[in-house]
Each structure stands twice: as structure tokens, then as C-alpha cells.
């Protein structure tokens, strides 16, 4: 009745302890859409999750208002929360959507 996502924590004796950058081979990028960035950051911090800096907000271009910040899962996986409070810029020119956060 909806999407499902599994994230695993693996261990091994020869495990590297440095997580890959998003731009590295084998890197990853997983983002979660949030309606309220401040509330989402507070939720993560209240749970003891390390938020990597302050949220970044675009103030011009077609991405005006887009806000994002990375955080670290307890097992070292870098994840992101993102918000588009004014929608995405391309949406003004077409009825097509890349994705819809309601689903």
C-alpha cells in the first residue's frame, strides 16, 4: 500500500571506516522530502543524529527556496533532507512532474 525502503548496516573485519563521498564510485545519494525543514532538523537533533552543518537555501534561479542539509545515520551513511516550499522552478512551465512528495 505504499513505498518501502530497506537500509542495511553491514560489518566485516576488513571494513573501511571512511564513508564514500556522494561523488565517489560506490557513493550514494538518498534524500527525504520534508515539508518543514526546521522541524525536521530539530527532530533529527533531538534523536541524537548528527546534522552536517546548517540548512542551505537557494535564493535565486529556478530553484529559489530549495533547502537541503545532510545528516549521518548512526551507522555512518550520509543522507539528506530536502524541501521545495515554492515547488520546483520547471513546474511553472509544464504540468509534468518528476515526482510528487505526496506519494
Label each residue range with its predicted role.
Residues 1:
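Short, structured active-site "lid" loops
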Residues 5, 32, 38-103:
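Vicinal oxygen chelate
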Residues 9:
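Pocket-edge structural micro-motifs
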Residues 13-14:
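Amide-forming acyltransferase catalytic core, primarily the GNAT-like/NAT-type
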Residues 20-22:
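Short consensus segments that form the blades of beta-propeller domains
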Residues 27-28:
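Eukaryotic phosphotyrosine signaling hubs
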